[in-house]
């Protein structure tokens, strides 16, 4: 069936899933190369620049659950994910849950903006406050991938490329990786694991 403007508007989730499958296939064919490696043994040993180019030492996130996600502003999955991020941020204090969002422009060029534009976009959708860490734009796959993403893939036991925008990782309060989740997995569907990890401290 041809995707008309009406069809895309009525079924955005279905269209987004097709995008994810298509890009995953392209990634398998043309991306990748060598598998990522990491000498880091714990998420809390890492650091990265935030959206304002300030260094964030992840040991400051000790004893809280961390959801790491690669975000984009112009993706079919954007609206639903940011809405669910806002719901989680409204329910759990930063001392329980922090969402660490890395803008990435590797998938269809869907995060083309400047850091200032990305920050304004995220803030307007409720991604703000102490529990919302918006990071500097990074690559998540390939030779220039962020060391954070190399670590997450290795620690999760799945070194395949991130398939699309909004791939997710859950990190335990002790800095070990709990799980890796597909772009189509909504943030709220992970809430049961988030609560479990909060209560495990």
From Swiss-Prot:
InterPro entries: Glutathione_peroxidase, GPX_AS, GPX_CS, Thioredoxin-like_sf. GO terms for molecular function: glutathione peroxidase activity; phospholipid-hydroperoxide glutathione peroxidase activity. It is found in: Mitochondrion. The keyword Mitochondrion applies. The keyword Oxidoreductase applies. It catalyses: 2 glutathione + H2O2 = glutathione disulfide + 2 H2O. GO terms for biological process: arachidonate metabolic process; lipoxygenase pathway; response to oxidative stress. The active site is at 75. Its EC number is 1.11.1.9. GO terms for cellular component: mitochondrion. Residues 1-27 form a transit peptide. It comes from the Eukaryota. Its main location: mitochondrion. Gene3D superfamilies: Glutaredoxin (3.40.30.10). May constitute a glutathione peroxidase-like protective system against oxidative stresses. Hydrogen peroxide, tert-butyl hydroperoxide and cumene, but not phosphatidylcholine hydroperoxide, can act as acceptors. Belongs to the glutathione peroxidase family. This is Glutathione peroxidase 1, mitochondrial. It comes from Chlamydomonas reinhardtii (Chlamydomonas smithii).
